[in-house]
A protein has these predicted regions:
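Extended, histidine- and acidic-residue-enriched regions that form the cofactor-binding/catalytic faces
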Residues: 1-46, 54-204
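Conserved SAM-binding loop
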Residues: 49
């Protein structure tokens, strides 16, 4: 069974930006945990949760844990919400260019999913407002796993502390066509189709 998506999620770090509405962590966790518990109560044993918003993940992990504590035989997969691209792309995106939100990659995703909603004539420029500590790490010559962990640690938890227009990244969003979104999404879909088939073949 494929359920309707939840239209609201956990986006506290974007609170204060025009038009941004977020559920509290407690409410979001409660909603997801209740959905899972009711499904498991009705006899379902497995669930796959897809979330394209990475900000949902900490709360989703808690919701899944709550539901699985109540139903010890339940099985849940939290599907990575990001298209399957190379490790080098991820490093360039998240550390080298700080392209976490509303930048080059997410503009490419909007173009892929809802091209008619993308006003290519009004795409804002890259972000130049991020804190100096983040810029210093971005410009480091040889990036490694420690740098990735440090980037997560030093990143402020509110968009207003990073950007005036919501864009986090230092790369130009108008160059979105260079991102291979179609092939990445095809790989993403194939990965989870194969996962579900293998999962289905396993005995409960």
């Amino acid at each position: 069974i494929v359920f309707s998506p939840l239209q609201l999620g956990y986006s506290f770090n974007h609170a204060g930006m025009p038009g941004t509405i977020s559920l509290s962590a407690e409410i979001f966790i409660d909603i997801v945990a209740n959905i899972l518990r009711q499904l498991f109560q009705q006899g379902w044993k497995r669930a796959v949760i897809f979330s394209g918003h990475n900000g949902n993940w900490p709360a989703l992990r808690v919701a899944v844990q709550i539901a699985r504590e109540a139903y010890i035989d339940a099985q849940v997969v939290l599907a990575d919400g990001y298209p399957r691209m190379s490790d080098e792309h991820r490093k360039n995106r998240f550390v080298r260019n700080f392209d976490y939100h509303a930048g080059l990659t997410e503009t490419a995703l909007v173009s892929y999913f809802a091209k008619d909603l993308l006003d290519t004539e009004s795409i804002p420029p890259a972000n130049q407002d991020m804190p100096d500590a983040i810029k210093k790490l971005m410009n480091k010559k040889d990036l490694d796993e420690i740098d990735t962990v440090l980037m997560n640690a030093i990143t402020p938890q509110h968009t207003q502390a990073l950007s005036t227009n919501g864009i986090w990244g230092a790369n130009d969003p108008s160059l979105f066509e260079q991102i291979p979104v179609r092939s990445a999404m095809e790989s993403y879909v194939d990965f989870y189709v194969q996962l579900i088939k293998r999962w289905d073949a396993l005995e409960l």
